Amino acid sequence: GLMEDTIIFYYGDHGGVLPRSKGYTYESGLQIPLVVYVPEKWKHLIPFDRGSRSQTFVEFIDLAPTALALAGVNVPTGMDGTPVMGKIVQKSEIQNKNTAFGYADRFDEKYDLVRTLRVGKYKYTRNYQPFNIDALFNFYRYKMLAYKEWLSLYREGKLNDVQSQFFEPKSPEALYNIDQDPHEINDLSNSENHQEILLRMRGQLHERIKEMPDLSFYPEPYLLDNAIVNPTTFGQNNKTAIAELIAIADLNLAPYDLVEGKIKLALQDKNPWKRYWGLIVCSSFGMQAKGLVPQIQKILQTDEVNLVRIRAVEFLMLNKISFDKNILKILLENTSSETEANLILNTISLIKGYQPEIKFNFSKEIFPGEWHDEPNDLVNRRLEYLMN
């Protein structure tokens, strides 16, 4: 009789296995099936008819409060998500729930920083580091023949513009009509007819990540050192500081000449993470920021924070501006943790993705052995790629 007394949730944790699905914020990676089995005796807890299909948007964060509501337990104040089933849930309250938040940070050794907001048929995507190409090497993905063939065809110049998007810089923001464009290849962010929708969804996403607040505007090594014990308290204590970092990150949404002065101030700030984000914004603008090269070169030479200096390297190498490459070796030698090493190696791997012919003059011995003594260590995966 256990089957008649059990509500079962059946769902996946990500989209499909083909390239550009799992590990990306496209709908092919985010949208998954959710099937709920409800026995006859518990159907009164479900706001929908058994055997029916609902278009209600359900996020992962909704599952915990839903389980509590089904069990008749009050959902704690402050818990993320909204119950979509339970005695307290009315169909009229959730049948029009059509908003979903998505994100991408690190997948194994591959870093990016992407946030998405889906509202009905429209989806807004915010690429905070748009120079991070989707094709950035990731060990397990490139074991798949489809990834390998796609990369080979790109390098041979055999892809059309749509097929090539995967290997090229993204725009800082994008807007898609999912009903008409389910594969998210037709960006509407520059369409005059969609500016009202774009600005509204941009604002909604901005307010959401500020209110959370979104901890990922600090680099992961810093979070592990300062926030891992109690990330909620850390976030609330640093809410204003995070909002200031988000404001700097958002400078790449404006024309460069209107924000150059603010970028300069960020690069000069005493807060290293403001300098960090100022450099990321420079890389987003590319050679439009060439007037800041002397300031960026000074940061590379004199900044006390390794992760700030590597962002200076990133700008210079993305724009093929010469500097002493021995600095790379110094930065790697000065890494204080495996996580910091992996983040630095992500930048170096990105450069190799853009410039496959480039060679680097360091070896695995630059790091402690325990960082790369197992084949699946993230640092080892990056080093295997860079050394091969």
Question: For the regions a protein language model found, what residue spans apply to each?
Answer:
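Polar, surface-exposed loop/tail segments
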Residues: 4-6, 51-119, 194-203
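Structural recognition of the beta-strand scaffold that forms the well-ordered cores
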Residues: 8-10, 34-36, 100-102, 123-126, ...
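Histidine-centered active-site microenvironments of extracellular/periplasmic hydrolases
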Residues: 2-59, 79-80
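Long, internal low-complexity/basic segments
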Residues: 31, 157-172, 188-388
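C-terminal, low-complexity/hydrophilic appendages and adjacent surface loops
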Residues: 27, 107-190, 196-197
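A generic secondary-structure signal for well-formed alpha-helical elements
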Residues: 1, 39-42, 70-75, 88-92, ...
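Short, solvent-exposed loop/turn and secondary-structure capping segments
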Residues: 19-24, 46-47, 69, 136-137, ...
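Short glycine/proline-rich turn/loop motifs
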Residues: 42-49, 179-185, 255-261
